[in-house]
A protein has these predicted regions:
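Ubiquitin-like/PB1-type beta-grasp interaction modules and other compact soluble beta-rich domains
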Residues: 1-78
């Protein structure tokens, strides 16, 4: 399991699955916070939590829950 930086100790963490990989994140992590943790560019990204696409406008207020299955999809140019 990959772990995000420990800010509040192990008791203040929750386990989520991001693109099929387990990740421990701080409790109350939002989608916006998750993007920062995994270090991806925000442009051209779509995110679904538990199979439901989350609008970009909701990323700052959408708090992840323990066991959340997050899919991060990035657009790629090409042909």
């Amino acid at each position: 399991m990959t772990e995000a930086p420990d800010r509040d100790g192990p008791a203040a963490r929750l386990d989520v699955v991001v693109n099929g990989e387990a990740l421990a994140v701080p409790a109350a992590t939002t989608i916006d916070g998750l993007i920062a943790i995994v270090g991806i560019e925000r442009r051209g990204v779509a995110i679904a939590v538990d199979g439901q696409v989350v609008p970009r406008s909701a990323w700052r207020r959408s708090v992840l829950h323990c066991g959340a299955r997050v899919e991060i999809v990035t657009a790629a140019a090409g042909g």
